[in-house]
Design a protein with these regions (language model features):
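Basic, glycine/lysine-rich polyanion-binding surfaces/domains
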Residues: 1-135
Length: 135
């Protein structure tokens, strides 16, 4: 049986564990592959799929840092928040995981947001974008 494992994901160390974010189209296959590998290797670990509990917003482009900085106290400069890292931050009063990534060759973040906070975070980002960056 051929196993499928997509490399379109972000994996980061979280204390003694890992945070894995996979692209939506390949998430199920990735989860199945990881579960099978854990079982095959006999690792004594737990794996929790939080896909249904989370949403994701992608904020990309040259103004992404300025827009996000209007809604968080977290420093977003290159030294404080290097490329390809992630941090738990507060955005518009909501705790989110911010991943500094780029899909367009420019500055950008992915925000992984608890389901209940998705709409308020989106609305806050949208308001900042239109009130300050769109003439």
């Amino acid at each position: 049986m051929k196993k499928y494992f997509s490399f379109d994901k972000n994996i980061s160390v979280q204390g003694r564990g890992f945070y894995i974010a996979a692209a939506g189209g390949a998430a199920y296959q990735n989860l199945s592959h990881i579960r099978a590998a854990l079982q095959d290797q006999g690792f004594n670990v737990s794996l929790e799929d939080r896909s249904q509990d989370m949403g994701m917003l992608s904020l990309q482009g040259p103004y992404s840092r300025e827009i996000l900085s209007k809604l968080t106290q977290t420093p977003l400069d290159n030294e404080s928040f290097p490329f390809n890292t992630n941090q738990m931050i507060t955005v518009a009063g909501h705790r989110v995981r911010a991943l500094r990534v780029s899909f367009v060759g420019e500055l950008g973040w992915e925000l992984h947001i608890p389901r209940a906070s998705c709409v308020p975070v989106y609305q806050a980002l949208h308001q900042v974008r239109y009130s300050q960056f769109i003439p």
